[in-house]
UniProtKB/Swiss-Prot annotation:
This is Adenylate kinase. Residues 126-132 are annotated as: LID. Its EC number is 2.7.4.3. It is an enzyme of class 2 (transferase). Residues 32-61 are annotated as: NMP. Pathway: Purine metabolism; AMP biosynthesis via salvage pathway; AMP from ADP: step 1/1. Pfam families: ADK. GO terms for cellular component: cytoplasm. AMP binds at residues 33, 38, 59-61, 85-88, 92, 129, 140. One of its GO terms (molecular function) is ATP binding. InterPro entries: Adenylat/UMP-CMP_kin, Adenylat_kinase_CS, P-loop_NTPase. Keywords: ATP-binding, Cytoplasm, Kinase, Nucleotide biosynthesis, Nucleotide-binding, Transferase. The gene is adk. Belongs to the adenylate kinase family.
Length: 182
């Protein structure tokens, strides 16, 4: 089983849910940049306030900020890990690749969870997070298509991308992920 993984997909695709299940079953450390950022916002720090302003508009937090958070966490992990919500653009992917080479922890697999937009919007509105209103969701999906979608081709070319249909029940999606990472 691969131990250094990345889950990709649009907001609301179920990356966090699947990552939690996968990490629990296989003993990996779950690194969710969304959770890390929300924790920072909840702390009320200066950094958290800046992040909140950006996130509430549905925009992406700077590459430098997110990369430094991820680097700090990866340096303290000796076992396997699963990244969820990072990288979100080609620049971040290249920076992540450089970081992983530097710490001798190459990425072993990428799972793309694909879900139709209408299903995503419904899921996100029902989830009820503060930053999940329809206008913000639509903007987040637009940014995903513009910035994050190019990562699909990048990881396909590296031969480490597996595509999973995410419209199914949680257990079905999980089973498909397990089979693809065998």
């Amino acid at each position: 089983m691969k131990k250094k993984l990345l889950f990709l997909g649009p907001p609301g695709a179920g990356k966090g849910t699947q990552a939690n299940l996968f990490c629990k079953k296989y003993g990996l450390i779950h690194l969710s940049t969304g959770d890390l950022l929300r924790d920072e916002v909840s702390s009320g720090s200066v950094l958290g306030i800046k992040a909140a302003e950006i996130m509430n508009k549905g925009e992406l937090v700077s590459d430098e900020l997110v990369l430094s958070i991820v680097e700090g966490r990866l340096l303290n992990i000796n076992e396997g890990w699963l990244l969820d919500g990072f990288p979100r653009n080609v620049n971040q992917a290249n920076s992540l690749k450089d970081l992983l080479e530097k710490i001798n922890q190459p990425l072993e697999g990428v799972i793309l969870i694909k879900v139709a937009d209408d299903y995503l919007i419904k899921r996100l509105v029902e989830r009820g997070r503060q930053d999940d209103n329809e206008q913000v969701i639509t903007n987040r999906l637009k940014i995903y298509r513009e910035k994050t979608s190019p990562l699909i081709d990048l990881y396909k070319k590296q031969g480490i991308l597996e595509e999973i249909e995410g419209n199914a029940d949680i257990d079905v999606v999980f089973s498909c992920i397990e089979k693809s990472l065998g």
